[in-house]
Design a protein with these regions (language model features):
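Glycine-rich cofactor phosphate-binding loops and adjacent beta1-alpha1 units
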Residues: 191, 195-238
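Short glycine/threonine/proline-enriched tight-turn/helix- or strand-capping micro-motif at secondary-structure
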Residues: 17-29
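Extreme N-terminal starter segment of soluble prokaryotic enzymes
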Residues: 2-5
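NAD(P)H dinucleotide-binding glycine-rich loop of Rossmann-like/cofactor-binding domains
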Residues: 72-79, 87-154
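Short, flexible surface segments
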Residues: 35, 90, 146, 237-238
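Glycine-rich beta-strand-centered segment in the early N-terminal region that forms part
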Residues: 29-47, 57-100
Length: 238
């Protein structure tokens, strides 16, 4: 009997790091594809910071927590390997919440076809959770305008790096807050940020004053903590 591997969540995380003791590797029987269904072989899976919240028992969150004993939640990209669904054909790529498993049986609900000629890694970063978080936060909440100054914390992360590039393309002055010189070099020289603050090395207040002489119009918060207090002190009135 053909089987595939899945990983279930079996315990809630505490305050410390997430470890393997929270998970269980299981073998599952390959499902039969019924009418109106298709089978997806997952090729790439995204590990996102939001997962910690999904594992936690917070019933008032924007999404219910993962039930213990079930496949851990995650977004992924895969290829349809068998189909009895009129709208989904073998060989097509799909993306959506697939979980920590090699194969997924679906009726199409919650999955979207991938039509862009991009590699799976680009699809998961730009069109999955990081890209959606970046675009919704920047445009629905931040409402940036050309000529303004934006500061992005966690600027070298999956969300922050996209926010910075979008803002730069829209004509903003973009300053990123990062935790190393290597990350600072990357966001400035590779991604096109106008400046970088290494919070582990620089005096935050002094460096922000230097890089934002006209104040800060938009702040995209990814980290929390003392960084935001220094940014707030430089914010322009709206």
């Amino acid at each position: 009997m053909t089987t595939y591997t899945a990983i279930n969540l079996i315990a809630r995380p505490g305050a410390g790091p997430v470890g393997p003791e929270l998970f269980e590797v299981v073998s599952k029987q390959m499902p039969s594809v019924g009418e109106g269904q298709f089978l997806v072989k997952q090729n790439h899976m995204s590990l996102d910071p939001a997962m910690f919240g999904w594992m936690s028992p917070d019933t008032e969150s924007y999404i219910p927590p993962v039930e213990l004993g079930t496949v851990m939640r995650s977004s992924g990209v895969g290829e349809i390997v068998e189909s009895k669904h009129p709208d989904f054909q073998v060989g097509e790529r799909v993306m959506g919440m697939m979980g920590w498993q090699e194969y997924l049986l679906s009726d199409g609900v919650g999955l979207n076809k991938v039509t862009a000629p991009l590699p799976d890694e680009a699809i998961l970063s730009v069109f999955a959770l990081p890209g959606l978080t970046a675009t919704q936060g920047l445009y629905s909440i931040g409402k940036p305008q050309k000529g303004e100054t934006i500061v992005v914390s966690g600027a070298a992360g999956s969300v922050g790096s996209i926010v910075g590039q979008l803002a730069k393309a829209d004509g903003l002055t973009v300053i990123g807050v990062v935790g190393s010189d290597e990350k600072a070099d990357w966001i400035v020289n590779e991604l096109g940020f106008d400046g970088a603050v290494n919070y582990k090395k620089h005096d935050l207040a002094e460096k922000l004053t230097e890089l934002t002489p006209n104040g800060i119009d938009v702040y995209f918060e990814n980290t929390g903590g003392p960084i935001q207090h220094h940014v707030f002190a430089r914010m322009n009135a709206h």
